[in-house]
Curated annotation (Swiss-Prot):
<feature type="glycosylation site" description="N-linked (GlcNAc...) asparagine">
    <location>
        <position position="413"/>
    </location>
</feature>
<keyword id="KW-0964">Secreted</keyword>
<dbReference type="GO" id="GO:0005902">
    <property type="term" value="C:microvillus"/>
</dbReference>
<feature type="glycosylation site" description="N-linked (GlcNAc...) asparagine">
    <location>
        <position position="100"/>
    </location>
</feature>
<keyword id="KW-0732">Signal</keyword>
<dbReference type="GO" id="GO:0005768">
    <property type="term" value="C:endosome"/>
</dbReference>
<dbReference type="GO" id="GO:0005615">
    <property type="term" value="C:extracellular space"/>
</dbReference>
<keyword id="KW-0406">Ion transport</keyword>
<feature type="signal peptide">
    <location>
        <begin position="1"/>
        <end position="22"/>
    </location>
</feature>
<dbReference type="GO" id="GO:0015889">
    <property type="term" value="P:cobalamin transport"/>
</dbReference>
<feature type="binding site">
    <location>
        <position position="171"/>
    </location>
    <ligand>
        <name>cob(II)alamin</name>
    </ligand>
</feature>
<comment type="subunit">
    <text>Interacts with CUBN (via CUB domains).</text>
</comment>
<feature type="binding site">
    <location>
        <begin position="365"/>
        <end position="370"/>
    </location>
    <ligand>
        <name>cob(II)alamin</name>
    </ligand>
</feature>
<feature type="glycosylation site" description="N-linked (GlcNAc...) asparagine">
    <location>
        <position position="311"/>
    </location>
</feature>
<dbReference type="GO" id="GO:0031419">
    <property type="term" value="F:cobalamin binding"/>
</dbReference>
<feature type="binding site">
    <location>
        <position position="222"/>
    </location>
    <ligand>
        <name>cob(II)alamin</name>
    </ligand>
</feature>
<dbReference type="InterPro" id="IPR002157">
    <property type="entry name" value="Cbl-bd_prot"/>
</dbReference>
C-alpha cells in the first residue's frame, strides 16, 4: 500500500504533525464527551508514586492534553530516572516516546534501544505474531528520533514480516502499521527505492489483515485492540478493500465505555488517543507550552443505595495436560463469592479451600497476570503460559478486572503459544 503517496498530503502531515483522517465524521459527539473526560480522569488518577510508572499512560495523557500537570510531571520524572537495563525493546521504546511526548530528553536510552535492535535476532517467519510487537514499537521510536539510522532496522523487520507465516494478531498488526508508516513517510532523500517498495507491500498486507477483523458493529479484533487498530487505519491514505466505517466504531466504543468496559489504566491508555483524534505518529508534535488545564466537569452520579450483595457460584478448573511437564492435572472446584467480585477473588477463595489451587501473580502494564498455578510456572523459554477461558472463549480481561457471572465455568489452562 502506498502510504501518503501524494506528496502534498505528506508535506501537510509533516507540517501539522497530525493524522489525516476525517475527524469531522469520526469524532466524539459533544453529548458523549463526558464519557471521554471521565476516562481521562480515571487514567490520570491511576498515577501515583506507589504504582509502577507506565509509559503508555504518559503517552496517552500527553496526546489527549494532560489535565493534571502534577501527575504528568511525576510520571515523566520517574520514567526519565528509570534504568534501561532489564527493559524489553518494547518497554524501552515506549519510555523514549513517553519522554519525547513530555518534551524530555531520553538521553542514552535511544542509543541503548538502537543497540538492542541491531542485535535483535531475526525471528523465524513462523514466530508468534506478538513477538513482533516490541520490535515494531522500537522501529517507531527510532523512526521518530532518527529515520535514517532506523532504516536498516526497519527493513530487516519488514522483510521478516513479508515472509510471515504466523497467525495474524490485531494489536501487532496495528503497531507494525504505525511503525512502517512512519518509516515510509520519512525515508531519507536519496535512499534506494527498494525500501519504499518493501514498506509499501508489507503495509498493504497488514492493513488488509486488520480490515478483515472489522466486525459488523465496528469493533476491530476485540474491544481492547480497537484503539490501536483505529490509529493504524486512520493514518492510511489508501483505504483497504473492506471499507472502514469509523463512526460506527466510535459509536460502539462509546457504548462500551458507558457500560464500564474501560477501567484498567492500560486499556484506557490504548483507546484514549483515538477518542481524541490522535495517533502515536503525533508524539513528536505534542505541544509542551505551559497552559492552564481546566478539569472537566463530570456529571454527578446519584449515590448508590447500599444493598446486601448476594452470592454467586463459579466453577473453576485448573488444567495442565502438556507433555513434558512433570505434573499433569485437571481439577475443578465450585467457589461461592459475592456477586460483582472480580475473578481474582474466585482464585483466592479456591486457593484458601484447596492448596492445589495455589497461584502466583506478576504485575504487568496491563495489571496482574497469573504466572503460576499449583507450582507450574509460565516459561518464556518453553513458550508456556496460563490462559483463562470462560467456557471455551479466552478472556480478554485480566483476573483483577474480569467479573464472572453466576454459574459461569472458568478454566485456567496451561498451554503454549
Amino acid at each position: 500500500m502506498a502510504w501518503f503517496s501524494l506528496h502534498l498530503l505528506h508535506l501537510l502531515w509533516a507540517a501539522a504533525g497530525t493524522s489525516t483522517w476525517a475527524r469531522s465524521s469520526c469524532s466524539v459527539p459533544q453529548a458523549a464527551q463526558h464519557l471521554v473526560d471521565g476516562l481521562q480522569v480515571l487514567l490520570e488518577d491511576s498515577v501515583s508514586s506507589a504504582a509502577p510508572p507506565n509509559p503508555s499512560v504518559l503517552i496517552a495523557m500527553n496526546l489527549a492534553g494532560a489535565l493534571s500537570a502534577e501527575a504528568r510531571e511525576l510520571l515523566a520524572d520517574r520514567l526519565g530516572a528509570s534504568d534501561s537495563a532489564g527493559l524489553s525493546v518494547g518497554q524501552l521504546a515506549l519510555t523514549i516516546m513517553a519522554l519525547n511526548s513530555s518534551c524530555r530528553d531520553p538521553g542514552n536510552k535511544v542509543s541503548v534501544l538502537y543497540g538492542q535492535m541491531e542485535a535483535w535476532p531475526p525471528s523465524s517467519p513462523s514466530a508468534p505474531a506478538w513477538t513482533f510487537y516490541g520490535p515494531s514499537l522500537a522501529v517507531l521510536a527510532l523512526c521518530q528520533e532518527h529515520p535514517g539510522r532506523a532504516l536498516p532496522v526497519a527493513a530487516r523487520l519488514a522483510k521478516i514480516l513479508a515472509a510471515g507465516l504466523s497467525p495474524f494478531n490485531t494489536d501487532t498488526g496495528a503497531m507494525v502499521t504505525l511503525a512502517l508508516t512512519c518509516m515510509y513517510n520519512k525515508i531519507p532523500e536519496g535512499s534506494e527505492e527498494g525500501y519504499r517498495t518493501l514498506f509499501s507491500q508489507v503495509l498493504k498486507d497488514v492493513v488488509e489483515n486488520i480490515s478483515m477483523r472489522i466486525k459488523d458493529n465496528g469493533i476491530i479484533g476485540d474491544v481492547y485492540s480497537t484503539g490501536l487498530a483505529m490509529q493504524a487505519l486512520s493514518v492510511t491514505p489508501e483505504p483497504p478493500n473492506k471499507e472502514w466505517d469509523c463512526k460506527k466504531t466510535m459509536d460502539t466504543i462509546l457504548k462500551e465505555i458507558e457500560q464500564g468496559k474501560f477501567h484498567n489504566p492500560m486499556s484506557i491508555a490504548q483507546i484514549l488517543p483515538s477518542l481524541k483524534g490522535k495517533t502515536y505518529l503525533d508524539v513528536p508534535y505534542v505541544s509542551c507550552s505551559p497552559g492552564h488545564q481546566v478539569q472537566p466537569t463530570l456529571p454527578s452520579q446519584p449515590s448508590p443505595v447500599p444493598t446486601s450483595a448476594s452470592n454467586i457460584t463459579v466453577a473453576y478448573t485448573i488444567n495442565n495436560q502438556l507433555k513434558g511437564v512433570e505434573l499433569v492435572f485437571n481439577e475443578t472446584i465450585d467457589v461461592s463469592v459475592k456477586d460483582g467480585s472480580v475473578l481474582l477473588v474466585v482464585l483466592e477463595e479456591a486457593q484458601r479451600r484447596n492448596p492445589m489451587f495455589k497461584f502466583v501473580t506478576t504485575m504487568t502494564s496491563w495489571g496482574l497476570v497469573v504466572s503460576s498455578i499449583n507450582n507450574i510456572a509460565e516459561s518464556v523459554h518453553d513458550r508456556t503460559y496460563w490462559q483463562f477461558l470462560s467456557g471455551k472463549t479466552p478472556l480478554n480481561e485480566g483476573v483483577a478486572d474480569y467479573t464472572p457471572r453466576d454459574h459461569e465455568h472458568i478454566t485456567a489452562n496451561f498451554t503454549q503459544y
